[in-house]
C-alpha cells in the first residue's frame, strides 16, 4: 500500500511540472528565434561610422568610451535602492490593515535601516558634488 501511494504521489508531482517544463521549452525557443531573427532579416551595413554614437545629426565631439565620474554611478545606485524601497512599501500600504501589528513593526525596522543608511551617506559626503 505504501509503495503504490509513493508512486502515485511521484506521478502526480511529475504531471504538475510537465506544464512548467513545456512553458520553459517554449520560452527558450521563442527567445532563440527572437535573437536570431535580426541576423537574417536586418540589412547589413559596412559603413565606417556604423558603430559610432549618434549626437543629433552633428559630428562626434569626443570618443564614445568617455570616462564618467564615479559619483554618477553612486547616485544611480542610491536611486535604485530608494526606488526599491518605494516598490516594497506599495504592497504593504495596500494590505496594511490585514497584516496586523507585526507587519507594521517589520516595515518600521525596514524604514529605520534605510534611513540610517541615507543619513550615513549624507554625513559621509557621498551626495556632495564638490
Swiss-Prot record:
EC numbers for this chain: 7.1.1.-
Molecular-function GO terms, alphabetical: NADH dehydrogenase (ubiquinone) activity; NADH:ubiquinone reductase (non-electrogenic) activity; quinone binding
Family annotation (InterPro entries): NAD(P)H_OxRDtase_bac/plastid, NADH_UbQ/plastoQ_OxRdtase_su3, NDAH_ubi_oxred_su3_sf
Signal peptide start-end: none
Keywords carried by this UniProt record: Cell inner membrane, Cell membrane, Membrane, NAD, Quinone, Translocase, Transmembrane, Transmembrane helix, Transport, Ubiquinone
Main location group: membrane
This protein's record includes keyword Iron: no
Class of the enzyme per the UniProt entry, highest EC level: translocase
Sequence intervals crossing the membrane: 17-37, 74-94, 99-119
Compartment list: Cell inner membrane
GO annotation, cellular component aspect: NADH dehydrogenase complex; plasma membrane
PANTHER family to which the protein is assigned, alphabetical: NADH-UBIQUINONE OXIDOREDUCTASE CHAIN 3
Subunit details: NDH-1 is composed of 14 different subunits. Subunits NuoA, H, J, K, L, M, N constitute the membrane sector of the complex.
Biological role stated in the UniProt entry: NDH-1 shuttles electrons from NADH, via FMN and iron-sulfur (Fe-S) centers, to quinones in the respiratory chain. The immediate electron acceptor for the enzyme in this species is believed to be ubiquinone. Couples the redox reaction to proton translocation (for every two electrons transferred, four hydrogen ions are translocated across the cytoplasmic membrane), and thus conserves the redox energy in a proton gradient.
Family under the similarity heading: Belongs to the complex I subunit 3 family.
The protein's name: NADH-quinone oxidoreductase subunit A
Organism expressing this protein natively: Neorickettsia sennetsu (strain ATCC VR-367 / Miyayama)
Encoding gene (name): nuoA
Amino acid at each position: 500500500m505504501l509503495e503504490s501511494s509513493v508512486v502515485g504521489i511521484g506521478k502526480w508531482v511529475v504531471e504538475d511540472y510537465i506544464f512548467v517544463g513545456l512553458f520553459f521549452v517554449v520560452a527558450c525557443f521563442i527567445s532563440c528565434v527572437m535573437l536570431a531573427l535580426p541576423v537574417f532579416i536586418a540589412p547589413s551595413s559596412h559603413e565606417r561610422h556604423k558603430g559610432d554614437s549618434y549626437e543629433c545629426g552633428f559630428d562626434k565631439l569626443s570618443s564614445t568610451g568617455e570616462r564618467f565620474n564615479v559619483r554618477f554611478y553612486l547616485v544611480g545606485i542610491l536611486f535604485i535602492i530608494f526606488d526599491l524601497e518605494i516598490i516594497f512599501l506599495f504592497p504593504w500600504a495596500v494590505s496594511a490593515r490585514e497584516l496586523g501589528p507585526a507587519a507594521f513593526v517589520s516595515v518600521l525596522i525596514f524604514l529605520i535601516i534605510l534611513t540610517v543608511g541615507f543619513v550615513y551617506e549624507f554625513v559621509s559626503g557621498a551626495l556632495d558634488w564638490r
